Amino acid sequence: AANRVSTLFGPDAVLLILPADHLIEDQSSLAESVEQAVSLAATGKLVTFGVVPTKPETGFGYIECDTPLAPDCFKVRRFVEKPDQQTAQNFIESGRYIWNAGMFCFTAGTMLDEIGHFLPDTLNLARDCLAASHHGTDPDHHVVQLDASTLHKIADTSIDYAIMEKSEKIAVVSARFDW
């Protein structure tokens, strides 16, 4: 997606990646968090969203917040996969951890730079796939039918593990919405 968006709109175009299965009813709080994320993304950050925990939860991943970058925005110290109950309780008590919402915001150029740094082969394969794919002609919709013969060559890897947990450019917006 970052490759296509960069081609169409330039490397400073901002992408917002949201899971389809999240229900966020407080749209004004979501909009505020997105505005904060867009501002951070414009400075070259890969931004993730965290939700302030209401209880120890072993079914969610956590983000440890580091130094503040702006109100409710922090440099990320580390990501922690689903902890046990006692560790989750310790996280809540520390006040430094928030739930990982699995939502992202970044410029196309920053993401492409990080993919190129951590996964150069994947970036080259993705560019090959995009070049071989069918691009729709409707000027109002940028539909791409990915080429299956080149797509299957790209490793199936999570953005969390491949980029977010390795990059030094990660920031988190501590969102105030429930999800």
Residue ranges, per PLM feature:
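Catalytic core of tubulin tyrosine ligase-like
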Residues: 60-179
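Conserved beta-loop-beta/alpha segment of the NTase-like Rossmann-fold superfamily
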Residues: 1-68, 106, 112-118
